[in-house]
From Swiss-Prot:
SUPFAM superfamilies: Actin-like ATPase domain
The species this protein was found in: Agathobacter rectalis (strain ATCC 33656 / DSM 3377 / JCM 17463 / KCTC 5835 / VPI 0990)
Superkingdom in the source lineage: Bacteria
Function (record text): Key enzyme in the regulation of glycerol uptake and metabolism. Catalyzes the phosphorylation of glycerol to yield sn-glycerol 3-phosphate.
UniProt: ADP binding residues: T12, R16, T265, G308, G409, N413
Protein name as annotated: Glycerol kinase
Residues reported to bind sn-glycerol 3-phosphate: T12, R82, E83, Y134, D243
Binding annotation for ATP: T12, T13, S14, T265, G308, Q312, G409
Length: 498
């Protein structure tokens, strides 16, 4: 059998390729950042062609690093930034506009208008989601309504829609395969998570032609083969999942009640709820975790829009640090935040608040607060936001989390992990391999082609690096949580016109 599984990890700020072996070890890694476009306040875009070019480049680089050929790759799994919306010409393959990124808030007013029509419950029951500009549906409608000629071309069947994995599969197969997986489809706000089909009533409400939508398929199956022109031979594309669902799978959270948090650009908590969707009454969304072996597994999810992005803000805009990795060292220069709280609501607040008009706030400033306090408070804001979601999950599921599995770039920050354990009053378990998003995509692809025999086979690969136990006193924890809630309230509705 071929030696490796290739995971293509199409992130929000960079694309990566990781080659994994049977033990789940990383054998080769390549990564490249791509351009972020901010044409107006609250707008975020990517160039879909640049996403494709960088993804292909890092895949070739990862193979070259260890002299791997197409014959050495058993299958490819793809994981991706979710909700980000791409529309392209079916014949030429040219995107009609930049990709509209999940963080983009340009459709906030249209999302409000859907709520005002009393459609909140309809969307929640069918899609599991709250109505928000975050999801793909309003972005797709905006493209059809605002790109000259787009609606007419879509009605004629000339345009295709896809989230990033759909776009990459289409490009890798040179336009032969137009599919999405259930986990990504469940993030579009157009997919019925009960019937596993695009919802005709929602498509009619949004005026979106069904012909442009990809075919929904399980997360672990062979979708097609990569055209040999790219890697010198055909390779099956056998797995796909949105980044957060892939991380849940990579963390081997296979049982109902198991949960993970990924610290990336945003923070994303998912709890496996088994084969029945659990409806949230506390600002979470119900989503599909994965479809595999004829079964669909559901999850509760809390999405925090700004996490690692707040460290980028400290680096790029505030110039407080030279690199993201400096944040821990700088934050340790002070013993606390000196009463300062940072609420990084740069693009609104996600779960459990869902306030798209909230904006970033720093409160508790005195003459004694310096940049180290602000850096520490920014780190702490991630832990507070995660705890807000954990509290909502507990309320919805009735399950008291005994521990939290963590991954993503910022999980390497020991100070942040200790803050998380302290604020959430639960042990934080960090695995040896924190690249669980890419690993999840690799596992899904490998299962489909028999590289791994079973999910039990995969579970044996998970190994712990470090456990962070809560250390602060209960009264201090309660005081900090109370002050955080007070700070968050200051951010609400800031950008809304009175």
């Amino acid at each position: 059998m071929a030696k490796y599984i290739m995971a293509l990890d199409a992130g929000t700020t960079s694309n990566r390729c990781i080659l994994f072996n049977e033990k789940g070890e990383m054998c080769s890694v390549a990564q490249k950042e791509f351009t972020q476009f901010f044409p107006k306040p609250g707008w975020v875009e990517h160039d879909a062609e640049e996403i494709w070019a960088t993804q292909l480049e890092v895949a070739k680089e990862a193979m070259a690093n260890i002299q791997a050929t197409a014959a050495d790759i058993c299958a490819i799994g793809i994981t991706n930034q979710r909700e980000t919306t791409i529309v392209w010409d079916k014949n030429t393959g040219e995107p009609v506009y930049h990709a509209i990124v999940w963080q983009c808030r340009r459709t906030a007013e249209y999302a409000d208008s859907l709520k005002e029509k009393g459609l909140t419950e309809t969307f929640r029951k069918k899609t599991g989601l709250v109505i928000d500009a975050y999801f793909s549906a309003t972005k797709l409608k905006w493209l059809l309504d605002n790109v000259p000629g787009a609606r007419e071309r879509a009605e004629r069947g000339e345009l295709l829609f896809g989230t990033v994995e759909t776009w990459l599969i289409w490009k890798l197969t040179q336009g032969q395969v137009h599919v999405t997986d259930y986990s990504n489809a469940s993030r579009t706000m157009m997919f019925n998570i009960n019937t596993l089909k695009w919802d005709d009533e929602i498509l009619k409400e949004l005026d979106i032609p069904k012909s442009m939508l990809p075919k929904p398929m399980p997360s672990s199956c062979v979708y097609g083969e990569v055209n040999p022109v790219y890697f010198g031979g055909p390779i099956p594309i056998a797995g796909a999942a949105g980044d957060q669902q892939a991380a849940l799978f990579g963390q081997t959270c296979f049982r109902a009640g198991e949960a993970k948090n990924t610290y990336g650009t945003g923070c994303f908590l998912l709890m496996n709820t088994g084969e029945m969707p659990v409806s949230s009454k506390n600002g979470l969304v119900t989503t599909i975790a994965w479809g595999i072996d004829g079964k669909v597994v559901y999850a509760l999810e809390g999405s925090i829009f700004v996490a690692g992005a707040s460290i980028q803000w400290l680096r790029d805009e505030m110039k407080f640090i030279d690199s993201s990795t400096d944040s821990e060292y700088m934050a340790r220069k002070v013993k606390d935040t000196n009463g300062c709280y940072v609420v990084p609501a740069f693009t609104g607040l996600g779960a459990p608040y869902w306030d798209q008009y909230a904006r970033g706030t720093i409160v508790g400033l005195t003459r004694g607060v310096n940049k180290y306090h602000v850096i520490r408070a920014t780190l702490e804001s991630m832990a507070f936001q995660v705890n807000d979601v954990l509290e909502a999950m507990k309320a919805d599921s009735g399950i008291n989390l005994t521990s939290l599995k963590v991954d993503g770039g910022a999980s390497a920050n020991n100070l942040l992990m200790q803050m998380q354990a302290d604020i959430s009053n639960a042990p934080v378990n960090r695995p040896v391999c924190v690249e669980t998003t890419a690993m999840g995509a690799a596992y899904l692809a490998g299962l489909a082609v028999g590289y791994w025999d079973s999910m039990d086979d995969i579970k044996r690969n998970w190994a712990i690096d470090r456990v962070f136990e809560p250390e602060i006193a209960d009264d201090m924890r309660e005081k900090k949580r109370k002050m955080w809630k007070k700070a968050v309230a200051c951010a609400f509705n800031w950008a809304k016109d009175d």
